[in-house]
């Protein structure tokens, strides 16, 4: 769901004011008010990304489909392969090859100990169509998603959905999963307080954000 930046700023200010023990910031002098608004706006996308990166899947919205992937599979050995990730890829929602018996929701990183098993010459030791594994790696071409493994190289991509890094669009809107909105406002409030050297209050609001997920 797309939320307008001006409304997000307003809601973050309310969160900050509700957690202050002195004069609410909404009653501050105009120059300070404008500075606060700018500081909040500069932390909105950071707050959205932090929340979306840790939120459980049932709180996330549909996500974005990988675009142009139909002919973009690069095959390796033992029916494993890889695809290039979209430039704005932040988090995988779901990935499934057509001959897999179940999809992958969580990915490994290249420094994960389990990743070494994907280099085994024994296919059963790697991920299989019954127990597939995906790994996010860095290649000369860009970040990629390696998958292990398919039954044959005739397999195609059946599902590929991800959460992108957030951005403010040309109309002043930000795409935020609706069920994560309250957590985002508290996360942004916490980041702003930390930037203003209000460490204890900022840490408290960051914990409030996590508790809502």
Report the location of each language-model feature:
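Glycine-enriched, solvent-exposed interface loops adjoining structured elements
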Residues: 1-132, 137-213
